[in-house]
A protein has these predicted regions:
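Sec-dependent N-terminal signal peptides
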Residues: 4-14
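Cystatin/cathelin-like cysteine-protease inhibitor module
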Residues: 17-164
Length: 164
């Protein structure tokens, strides 16, 4: 009898975790759609909620992936401008990509300098890769990180990095 009660308790806790995980992912998606406001968002992928230990804490593999993506974005900009020797002010795509990268650099610096110190558990993070249209109706790709409270009910910080 004890084994049956224990098995039911384990199954219920697994179901509750799965339900909470889905709720956090839905909250992040809703926040993304509302923040972009244009309704033309295509979700490419959503990570499972992961523990976070501060608002800038990233695991080493996450930092490495973000830096690699930012390097690829830089490569795209350099290729389109021939290493900045041929700048075309009419090239809206390159200008918009460079603007998104410059905005992301502040979060990147904070993440690199502050994320090595793993603090106390502060909640959850969810990453969404997506495609959307910017204010100039240009297609772009990005990843946005959502930092949620311990209960997974409130998003208290986001970071967005462009994707090439």
């Amino acid at each position: 009898m004890k084994k049956i009660v224990l098995a039911v308790a384990v199954l219920l806790s697994l179901a509750a975790c799965t339900e909470k995980s889905e709720q956090m992912k839905e909250l992040a998606q809703m926040s993304l759609r509302q923040s972009l406001g244009n309704g033309q968002v295509k979700i490419i992928g959503i990570s499972e909620p992961d523990s976070t230990f501060g608002t800038n804490y990233m695991r080493p593999d996450e930092k490495k992936a973000i830096i690699a993506n930012m390097n690829r974005v830089t490569d795209v900009i350099m290729k389109r401008t021939k290493n900045m020797s041929v700048f075309n002010p009419e090239d809206s795509y390159t200008i918009a990509l460079a603007e998104r990268q410059m905005r992301a650099n502040n979060d990147l610096r904070s993440m690199l300098y502050d994320s090595d110190t793993k603090g106390e558990w502060s909640g959850w993070k969810v990453k969404i890769d997506f495609e959307a249209k910017d204010g100039h109706n240009l297609d772009y790709r990005a990843e946005r990180w959502f930092f949620l409270d311990k209960e997974g009910n409130v998003i208290f910080k986001t970071m967005e990095f462009p994707l090439p």
